[in-house]
Amino acid sequence: MKYGEDVIAALTICWTVLGMPAGKRLAPMLTELVAVLRHFRELVISDETAALLVSMSAATIDRRLADERARYKIKGRVGTKPGSLIRSQIPVRTWAQWDDAVPGFVEIDTVFHDGGNRGGGHAFTLTVTDIATGWTESRSLPDRTAKHILAALNQIAAAMPFPILGVDCDNGSEFINDDLLAWCQDRRITFTRSRPGNKNDGCHVEQKNWVVVRTVVGYYRYDTASELLLLNEIWRLQSQLTNYFHPQQKLVSKVRKGAKVSRKHDTATTPFHRATDHPSMTLDRIVALKRTYSLINPAATQRQIQALTNQLFTLTTSKAPAGVPTPLTKRARSREATNNPSRAS
């Protein structure tokens, strides 16, 4: 089938609004997204163009967007630092203790905003990801002290659409301490930690460190109060896109045949739909989520985020000392779920 320039232009808009996902993630969302964008008049297209757009297959989407995707191929790394304190009091996570199918069991991790230089004070971002739904919230902190970690967790717990039932973390000292243990015990939250040396235990939140945090604010050094305020305003808006509109895939099975590993993923959908479709969700929570969803214009939200990140990048580059080159990597390229070897949603 031949697609005209108007169809490809509309496809590019949809792809950009959803954070440039792969075709297998974008295709299942097109019918819903096109309707939303037309409702807010972000897409002014004919019914015929809309019908052609939503009928595109994942493979066709990838082919048509190949040139656009090539423009954004930027790579980088995420930094987290291991540590140890009261490990004996915090059980190592095992699958027998952990119910991934129920919303409320989350993985937590921190992302460094040090600009490649760990010296001196700088901001961190706490990422919290629900395993069952993929719902993700982020908060940036001036440091990793218990005071700021717990304050961020309280904010995130209030923002989540369901109660937190379990917290799983790595062995970093910002998490393995009496303060977080007491916070979980007071709230009757199961508190577990990953196995030392097994990075894949926290694969869901590690993926979101990349897909949510690095693709939005990159690898610059953020160490001022103004930058911290901007970061948290960005996370408030990014939560709307990530949770209500960005499609995600979950690994269903992995079969090894000799040297070949075959992975099967489910149909891409959003954390919002995974949450509202789950039998454990109460009616009042579902109604509240749907009300919020109906008010979000994803294209306008994306523009707001872009404006805020531009302010953030201007702030951080303008304070760079003379003679120090500006980091080339502003943003990381999102890893696609269909190519990602981890168990992340």
Residue ranges of each PLM-predicted region?
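Secondary-structure boundary/capping micro-motif
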Residues: 1-166, 171-345
